[in-house]
Amino acid sequence: MGRAEQKADVLVKDQSPGDVKNEVSSRPEDAHSFRLLSAEDKHGFMLLVLLYMLQGIPVGLAFGTMPFLLKSYVGYSQLGIFMLSTYPYSLKLLWSPIVDSLFVSAWRIPCTKLELSLGRRKSWIVPIQLIVGITFLVISYQIDALLENAETSIYLITLVFFGLIVLAATQDIAVDGWALTLLSEENVGFASTAQTIGINVGYFMSFTVFLALNSVEACNKYLRFRPQSTPILTFPAYLQLCAAA
């Protein structure tokens, strides 16, 4: 056996299983790609993106839009009171065991013979979306008055958005758990990608995009041929749009 062959044999023997695994996984044909997912996993991925996007809308409102709007009406101390409404999103670990353990397998629609199949995750997601939609619709008729009288209504505004963030955090727990079974085992890593895309799109839509469409100056400068005195999208109209979604 030549010296070169002996050296190659020693190198092969010195390789650890991890080295071999890394070498194999680095091959282009073994890399995971969205276009290589099965149709079922693609549908699951898109559903996760949609659910995370809906979750990102109230998060963007509470963390971005409302503080931006409130600073024109209240001082820093009252703005700090409102920011208490964002705390539940960081404390969702406290009630995540409840979300994982309590659920309804099926729900019979009153006055009908129809039965809605829910399960462990949809038992939380479906009611949460209904409550969030109704809340958006109700406050859309009062939000302008609440902002104009923010100094006296700051606690009510904080309470409303505290509830919305609790619901968003609870949905996050349910969707995270559902992602583990919605995608196949070898593609479950795409759940984090869906979460990143969905939440950021929802946050961006309810913060940056909304504020741009709500600004008369921005609308007249970038989006209109003729200046007008009203924005393209008012806050009540945006909340009603979110409620419909």
Predicted regions and their residues:
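Cytosolic juxtamembrane N-terminal segment immediately preceding the first transmembrane helix
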Residues: 2-52, 116-119, 123, 148
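Helix-loop boundary and gating motifs at the non-cytosolic
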Residues: 26-89
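Hydrophobic core of transmembrane alpha-helices in multi-pass small-molecule transporters
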Residues: 53, 128-174
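Intracellular juxtamembrane helix-capping segments at the cytosolic ends
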Residues: 66, 166-183
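Loop-to-transmembrane helix entry/capping segments in MFS-fold secondary transporters
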Residues: 76-79, 180-195
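Glycine-rich segments within core transmembrane alpha-helices of 12-TM secondary carriers
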Residues: 85-93, 132, 189-218
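Transmembrane alpha-helix termini and helix-breaking/packing motifs in multi-pass membrane transporters
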Residues: 97-107, 114-115, 140-148, 203-232
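Symmetry-related core transmembrane helices of the 12-TM Major Facilitator Superfamily/SLC fold
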Residues: 126-135, 158, 231-245
